[in-house]
């Protein structure tokens, strides 16, 4: 009986851990990893870690319990077979982008679904999410589009000032 209680406590602790990660993450991506070699899995984990993405494998039944408790019933249908979970805490698109890029090179990895800010997305929607650039890239593009007209305006003012100086001489 003591072993049964201990196992139950361990499972409850895992469910609590999964719930905490699901609540804390900006995005969560589920992927099927069946058939990946150890080397491929190691490379994938390294890429995800470098981007600040946590990559885990849990028992599907435990993830199901955690998801249902949080109201993410929509992901339960994707929890069949070997499923890995990538938790993105900083950049909401990073898990989908990295897993999708990896899946293009390694056909054994397949995106299944994602949760972004409480909304569940299917495989196709997750692939579309992967196409969105990172926040830093979007900010750089925005700043570039703001800076360009200002630079042109400054150049124009400089040219006018130079022309006035030439005509004054």
UniProtKB/Swiss-Prot annotation:
Biological-process GO terms, alphabetical: translation
Protein name: Large ribosomal subunit protein uL10
SUPFAM superfamilies listed in its UniProt record: Ribosomal protein L10-like (SSF160369)
Function summary: Forms part of the ribosomal stalk, playing a central role in the interaction of the ribosome with GTP-bound translation factors.
Family: Belongs to the universal ribosomal protein uL10 family.
GO cellular component: a single term: ribonucleoprotein complex
Highest taxon above the source species: Bacteria
Keyword rRNA-binding in annotation: yes
Subunit structure: Part of the ribosomal stalk of the 50S ribosomal subunit. The N-terminus interacts with L11 and the large rRNA to form the base of the stalk. The C-terminus forms an elongated spine to which L12 dimers bind in a sequential fashion forming a multimeric L10(L12)X complex.
InterPro entries with a match to the protein in the record: Ribosomal_uL10, Ribosomal_uL10-like_sf, Ribosomal_uL10_bac, Ribosomal_uL10_bac_type
Gene this protein is translated from: rplJ
Organism of this sequence: Clostridium perfringens (strain 13 / Type A)
Annotated signal peptide: none
Keyword annotations of the record: Ribonucleoprotein, Ribosomal protein, RNA-binding, rRNA-binding
PANTHER family assigned to the protein according to its UniProt record, in alphabetical order: 39S RIBOSOMAL PROTEIN L10, MITOCHONDRIAL (PTHR11560)
Record-level Gene Ontology MF annotations: large ribosomal subunit rRNA binding
Pfam families: Ribosomal_L10 (PF00466)
């Amino acid at each position: 009986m003591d072993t049964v209680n201990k196992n139950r406590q361990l499972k409850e602790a895992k469910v609590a851990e999964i719930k905490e990660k699901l609540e804390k993450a900006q995005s969560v991506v589920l992927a099927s990893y069946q058939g990946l070699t150890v080397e491929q899995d190691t490379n994938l984990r390294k890429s995800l870690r470098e981007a600040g993405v946590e990559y885990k494998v849990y028992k599907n039944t435990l993830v199901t319990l955690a998801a249902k408790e949080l109201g993410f019933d929509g992901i339960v249908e994707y929890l069949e077979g070997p499923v890995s979970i990538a938790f993105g805490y900083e950049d909401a698109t990073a898990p989908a982008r990295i897993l999708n890029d990896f899946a293009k090179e390694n056909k054994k990895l397949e995106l299944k679904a994602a949760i972004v800010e409480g909304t569940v997305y299917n495989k196709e929607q997750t692939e579309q999410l992967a196409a969105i650039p990172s926040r830093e890239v979007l900010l750089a593009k925005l700043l570039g589009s703001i800076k360009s007209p200002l630079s042109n305006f400054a150049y124009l003012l400089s040219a006018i000032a130079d022309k006035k100086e030439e005509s004054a001489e």
